Amino acid sequence: MRNQEVINKAEMTLSTLESGGIMNPTQASTFIRMVQDTPTILRDARVIQMDHDTQKIEKIGFGQRILRAAQEGVALTKDQKSVPSTSTVNLSTKEVIAEVNITYDTLENNIEKDGLQNTIMQMIAERAAVDIEELLVNGDTSSSDSYLAQLDGIRKQATSHIVDAAGEELTRQTFKRGYKAVPPKYLRIPQEFRFYTSPGIEVEWKDRVADRQTNLGDAAVQGGLSSAFGVPIKGIANLQPYTIGEGDTAADVSDIILTHPKNIILGFSRNIRIEVDKDIRRRMFIIVLTAKLDSVFEEEDAVAKIVKVKE
């Protein structure tokens, strides 16, 4: 297909996709799934597609033992009857905007791989997912960055169980202290939890494990998923390091977040707006995406954060 034909087809496809500015429900659901399928923390998280800008999610749990010794012919007393504790998690979306530039050459190189509309939506989703992950992880309403200041991300929300590594080197004790900080009632199946780290800390831990003359060490060298105390360790690109101290005492450190992946909720409104323009001088389409989202922990008490771990 000639370049001009690709451009003409892209214009027609984008005008259909734009659909008056708002994606139709099918397009929106497809796009959200594409965002979730990208290799970011979004793939692990629990993504909720919202019909409105705000939504309450009911959560239910038993904080104590509910089974009792059975006695034939004797009913449970009022004190022995378990009442589920109920509460809600509130999602209140914030509007985010992204500009995605797709060159004519990029379209031409991808035109034969799949339907053009699917190809374009995939390109937008892949580029938007990284920015969404950054907001989900590093959002801070006190930030000077207007994008990050829209909401508090999981790094800021984790406050109940903090372990301060004080700039010390990464060791098994670092993970052990974080593990023990989470109330045992949540860690019934440790392998379902994750230690989310910076890529640098993940590599440091794999390097330490690789020194062991075991199958685990061999797997770490070959890029397998490493673990600590039965909990897999996963590096997240946007869990970036920061500097503490000054002068000779300055050091690059980062945080580690321990939680169940599905404890991280990303609310994504289906009201997704897309607007398109064409820059003939730079030979590209300019696609502006506007979406609304929010992120919370379903159970913040089931989270531990290890801070100031040396990179």
Curated annotation (Swiss-Prot):
It comes from the Bacteria. Possibly a prophage capsid protein. Belongs to the encapsulin family. Family 3 subfamily. This is Putative prophage capsid protein YqbE. The gene is yqbE.
